[in-house]
From Swiss-Prot:
NCBIfam families: ispG_gcpE, PRK00366.1. This is 4-hydroxy-3-methylbut-2-en-1-yl diphosphate synthase (flavodoxin). It comes from the Bacteria. Keywords: 4Fe-4S, Iron, Iron-sulfur, Isoprene biosynthesis, Metal-binding, Oxidoreductase. Residues 381-392 have a biased composition (Polar residues). Residues 371-380 have a biased composition (Basic and acidic residues). Its EC number is 1.17.7.3. Binds 1 [4Fe-4S] cluster.
Length: 392
């Protein structure tokens, strides 16, 4: 009997092209489809504590934050905005709820943008004209930030709860009011704690407008839960070309949000990769403590921005092959580790020296990339892939 196996299916396509949006500037950071997707976070300091706020902004900047947001619930916070905006190395957005007067305070202070929550600012619709005029005069954008937890009562009454349709209708209604006053320097967010609702809302929004979109799963939770929720939601949207800025909301220090956000973008090849550690889940074949080895190598290379592929392998099944394919790697077994550089074994070291040796060799490769191959090589390597550390 003849069997027709047919032709193999074509592989699934890669990421969709970026959704075409209007372009805007948040300080010196471009936002929109012509620009790299930016990563944001929000200070957890009291904004009126200028020193503490600037210190946290400096930490976020070092971690790779592109844009930072600060709260402004009180007049003393508004009074501090000018100094914060003046000394911050990255653009400062002011987050406004309840009191419209703080919108104008933020604009007057020279902040790079203002986020407004139309669901809880008093009589906001009637103040849109004033806000549009002030923002236009200052040349700054407005983010219309709709949130499931504070949805405009009109849309809550209409839909019964914060559905994706309710979030989108609220955002587009407010945007239309700004447009009536000739102001289109707008970006939008429609955040929900449920990634499924959030994804649906952004997909609907993307189909109905060309505003840049700021992605976020609101109240995502502690680090593990929030990372999973954000990665799932952002991956679903970014793979379709939807999203121009992101914030990973975590119940954790803000620097953790930046680490996760950057890693999400790197994993989708939407940002040049730094080093990456690929490690297996371990099994009964492993002849070293894979978890300990992977964590120690990761900690030792923390902050390394050069794209190196580093393989840390725990057994002989995939170890030698993975190590040979990497820029740098180790295949471990019998209390020893074979160190590979560019596919060649350069030495064998005792297990206790594996981490130290890998870090030394990584630094040597970084030095060679800078002095012998030049910045063009680094740029090309960054585009083609990331430094990968593989632990099997």
């Amino acid at each position: 009997m003849n069997m027709r196996l047919g032709m193999p299916e074509a592989p699934a396509p890669g990421l969709a092209p970026r959704r075409i949006t209007r372009q805007l500037m948040v300080g010196n950071v471009g936002v929109g489809s012509d620009h790299q997707i930016s990563v944001q976070s929000m200070c957890i300091t009291k904004t009126h504590d200028v020193n503490a706020t600037l210190q946290q902004i400096a930490e976020l900047t070092t971690a790779g934050c592109d844009i930072v947001r600060v709260a402004c619930p009180r007049q003393e916070d508004a009074d501090a905005l000018a100094e914060i905006a003046r000394h911050s190395k990255i653009p400062v957005i002011v987050d406004i709820h309840f009191q419209p007067k703080y919108i104008f305070a933020a604009i007057d202070a020279g902040c790079a943008a203002v986020r407004v929550n139309p669901g809880n600012i008093k009589e906001f619709d009637g103040r849109v004209g004033e806000v549009a005029k002030a923002a236009a005069a200052a040349g700054i954008p407005i983010r219309i930030g709709v949130n499931a937890g504070s949805l405009d009562k009109r849309f809550m009454d209409k839909y019964g709860k914060a559905t994706s349709e309710a979030l989108v209708e609220s955002a587009l209604w407010e945007a239309s009011l700004f447009e009536e006053h000739g102001f289109g320097n707008i970006k939008i967010s429609v955040k929900h704690h449920d990634p499924v609702v959030m994804v649906a809302a952004y997909e609907q929004l993307a189909a109905q407008c060309d505003y840049p979109l700021h992605l976020g799963v609101t109240e995502a939770g502690p680090v593990f839960q929030g990372t999973v929720k954000s990665a799932v939601a952002f991956g679903a949207l970014l793979s379709k070309g939807i999203g121009d800025t992101i914030r990973v909301s975590l119940s954790a220090p803000p620097v953790e949000e930046i680490k996760v956000g950057n890693q999400i973008l790197e994993s989708l090849n939407l940002r040049p990769r730094s080093h990456e550690i690929v490690s297996c889940p371990s099994c009964g074949r492993a002849q070293v403590d894979v978890y300990k080895l992977a964590n120690e190598v990761s900690a030792g290379l923390d902050g390394l921005e050069v794209p190196l592929r580093i393989a840390v392998m725990g057994c002989v099944v995939n170890g030698p092959g993975e190590a040979r394919d990497a820029d740098l790697g180790v295949a471990s077994g019998n209390g020893k580790g074979q160190i590979f550089v560019k596919g060649e074994v350069i030495k064998t070291v005792p297990e206790a020296q594996i981490v130290e040796t890998l870090i030394e060799e990584a630094m040597r490769l970084v030095s060679e990339m800078g002095t012998e191959k030049g910045s063009d090589h680094c740029s090309e390597t960054t585009r083609s892939g990331s430094p990968v550390v593989t632990v099997n």
